UniProtKB/Swiss-Prot annotation:
Protein's organism: Fragaria vesca (Woodland strawberry)
Gene Ontology terms: cellular component: chloroplast
Keyword Nucleotide-binding: no
Protein name, UniProt field: Maturase K
Superkingdom to which the source organism belongs: Eukaryota
Function description: Usually encoded in the trnK tRNA gene intron. Probably assists in splicing its own and other chloroplast group II introns.
Entry's family note: Belongs to the intron maturase 2 family. MatK subfamily.
Amino acid sequence: MEEFQGYFELYRSPQYDFLYPLIFREYIYALAHDRGLNRSILFDNVGYDKKSSLLIIKRLISRMYQQNHFLISVNDSNQNKFLGYNKNLYSQMISEGFAVIVEIPFSLRLVSSLEETESIKSYNLRSIHSIFPFFEDKFPHLNYASDVLIPYPIHLEILVQTLRYCVKDPSSLHLLRLFLHEYYSWNTLITPQKSIFAKSNQRLFLLLYNSYVYEYESILLFLRNQSNHLRLTSSGIFFERIRFYEKIKYPVEEVLFPATLWFFKDPFIQYVSHQGKLILASKDTPLLMNKWKYYLVNFWQCHFYVWSQPGRIHLNQLSKHSFDFLGYLSSIRPNISVVRSQLLENTYLMYNAMKKLNTLFPIIPMIGSLAKVKFCNTLGHPISKSSWADSSDSDIIDRFVRIVGNISHYYSGSSKKKSLYRIKYILRLSCVKTLARKHKSTVRTFLKRLGPKLLDEFFTEEEQIFSLLFPRASSTLKRFYRGPIWYLDILCINDTVNHE
């Protein structure tokens, strides 16, 4: 952050924040390159870190300084080379550098907000799993929840307008327009699996998405504070970071809402958002939740000009329905405990029913994902991974162990572990079948020759941590412990099966 501060002050003016000149500085691309390497766990490697060099950057900057019109089109074929390199590489480099530049005012504003409020920057708040203790604490006391799909803008200019409050440099905004109009349309842009923009320029995509979500969340927070003096409990997870304090600190200005807000006076409303989905939960009646539903539709359509439909908002009773969030199927179920009480010669059994959050492992979608990448068939029967049969034994085992570890680590919060154990069994047997296929042997013969050492490789981190927390616990207790375990070091959802 100190280096950001130094770079930003070089081009800062009392009237405008001139960010555009930074696009011609070599250290910006060095920062983008270094940060891209640090985030290799989250992003797929598209070759940028392999091909980038100081020489390429110097050629790119010198080309931008020339007077001729510098256009980079993703639609050009791969045969078109620019100074000996693919045009897509230069486009990606510029967009990555531009995203780093535009992040500077956001980062500086967040730091100043934390310093003014003397807020403690907790690393644990960045974890994806940190939202589930919040669910366990709040949701058992609530009755209804709305599962909402966040709509997307119908015009690219809306994305540019969301940045105009912080990025006041017209040249930077025009450059952003160039990137957006060169990369197809927003409909392709929001599907990372098929979009070049989301695949090769993920930092810029994340920045635009975060700013868009932050914009409407700030207005919702502003309206909530205007209609009720009680403080809103707000938390949310972005792709890159959680900004608890920044949301509360900065309301959106210059917005007029003449509509009546009397029906929003609910002190028990809870709000959580992540990856294009948000959840509104309340203790009040379904009438209030339905009013929230139609208000959100009108709010998005009238004030943000985004396409939204009531069918994208589902209202469910927490005690009867589950909601899908962050890969878990969560629901509120009664947990009955029996207490024996004795008064003189009489003994009583008291049944105490308490609501508890249940987080279930999504076994059917996970089997579908494993079947798609050929670890099993559609029925969940393990098969060999034929594309890995040419690798070494250690490489094959390491790949399977890494996938099992990622799945076990993320879904350690499951209330019931049976489905998780089944997925781990599928992957273990798929590993054995892959090794047996490589050595042209049967599974039984291969297991007899290798012995139990192969299964020891799949000793998961969850079991190791449980042994450290409860060293005196019996082996039976360690083996059959099925309580949820939440890790506060998970900053992103890994693509656990995409290891081709």
